[in-house]
Amino acid sequence: MLTQLSIEIISMTDKKYLFTSESVSEGHPDKVCDIISDYIVDDFLSQSDPENNRVALETLVTTNQVVVSGEVRGPDGFECNYEKLAREAVKWIGYEQEKFHWENFNFTSFVHGQSSDIAMGVDAKDNKDQGAGDQGIMFGYACKETPVLMPAPIYYSHLILQNLAKARKEKTISGIQPDSKSQVTLQYEGSKPINCTEVVVSTQHN
């Protein structure tokens, strides 16, 4: 599970230019938070009547600390075990370090029920009356530069970290930890990538 952190807006001309994309691994603090939040959202979606369940959640991670906060709404009688899900997520990522271990990190929850005012706005049956709440959705674009229809710099940046994670989990490379980052710079001519000019990979290690 990787993310593109920055996008440079450029004009597509016949001139040559450089375009750089960056990826972070599942062990990067930003992604740890994303994955914990995803585990919780998935739990709500697995319950009855998922279309009426609501999750607006923030996760904070620091040295041996995980904090979740926000507001939710699930079916009557449903109690989400936030701590269990957070530990499962961190275990899946692979953190078993002295300063951050899935078994013994300190967990705090400040999650509460959804505001009735927000519920009233987002629950309207008529689309004309339906509000947007305060959550947004980010989006990207598809192109023909790669087989998966992603821009080439971010595709190769992702691919590097996927192989690094595989090597770590299969122990073909020893001593590396979950937090890593890659950056790939390609040279373009017009709208076509023609050359790789720089690759940077950094990883947490023993």
Outline where the language-model segments fall.
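Short, Lys/Arg-enriched N-terminal segments with co-localized hydrophobic residues
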Residues: M1-S11
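N-terminal, positively charged regions that mediate nucleic acid binding
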Residues: I10-R54
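Glycine-rich, mobile lid/loop segments that gate access to catalytic sites or pores
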Residues: T20-S23, N64, A89-N206
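N-terminal low-complexity, intrinsically disordered segments
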Residues: H28-K31, Y82-E83, D117-A119
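Short, glycine/acidic-rich hinge or "gate" loops at secondary-structure transitions
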Residues: P50-L60, T172-P178
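Short, charge-patterned binding micro-sites
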Residues: V55-P75
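Short, conserved charged micro-motifs
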Residues: P75-Y82, L149
